[in-house]
Amino acid sequence: MAGEIPDLVAQERTGTGKGAARQARRDGMVPGIVFGGDVDPLPINIPFNVLIKKLREGRFKSTLFNMKVEGHDDVRVICRDVQRHVVKDLPTHIDFMRLKRTTKINLFIAVEVEGEDVAPGLKKGGVLTLIRPEVELIVTAGDIPDHVTIDISEMEIGDNITISSVNLPEGAKPTIDRDFVIAQLSAPAGLVSSDDEEEEDGAEEAIEATEE
């Protein structure tokens, strides 16, 4: 579960528009905007190196931050969009939304797997496919989970895990009503091919017997 809310320090951007955004990038900043909460949008700049480090740490868009901007009250925010350079894939603009701790929000939460070392299906050569490495959940802003865990320790070949069998964090629920599959354990390709060949051979023998 989420622990202490990390700080994210930004600077207020005095200018607006493309010209001010370009100047911010030349100064080693990434321009952004903070919106929502019945308050006027606040243009900001975040140091490029700081933002890159945060992005590389992972789960940036599912992390609740305490944003600190000089001259403004601290506010809890969550990232809603990171625009990137089409060629370099580096951040060029970032959007944050203000939140209260009790605000409900839709977020994609990472799925982590446990029990791989003892899963009988894997020991028999089965292949685990994580169909959804992330699941979209409705969560409370003040209690955003780092991840959800699926336990495959008892999975056999042919089994799957659906969202209804996952212990979700308290207060969290899926955005989709249907019981969708998160992971499945399939037979290895070679075994599937062998089974298919055996079925075909059996069918041919049956046809030959009929013709005789």
UniProtKB/Swiss-Prot annotation:
Residues 1-24, 189-212 are annotated as: Disordered. One of its GO terms (biological process) is translation. The keyword Ribonucleoprotein applies. Residues 194-212 have a biased composition (Acidic residues). InterPro entries: Rbsml_bL25/Gln-tRNA_synth_N, Ribosomal_bL25/Gln-tRNA_synth, Ribosomal_bL25_b-dom, Ribosomal_bL25_C, Ribosomal_bL25_long, Ribosomal_L25_dom, Ribosomal_uL5_bac-type. The keyword Ribosomal protein applies. Signal peptide: none annotated. Belongs to the bacterial ribosomal protein bL25 family. CTC subfamily. This is one of the proteins that binds to the 5S RNA in the ribosome where it forms part of the central protuberance. This is Large ribosomal subunit protein bL25. It comes from Roseobacter denitrificans (strain ATCC 33942 / OCh 114). The gene is rplY.
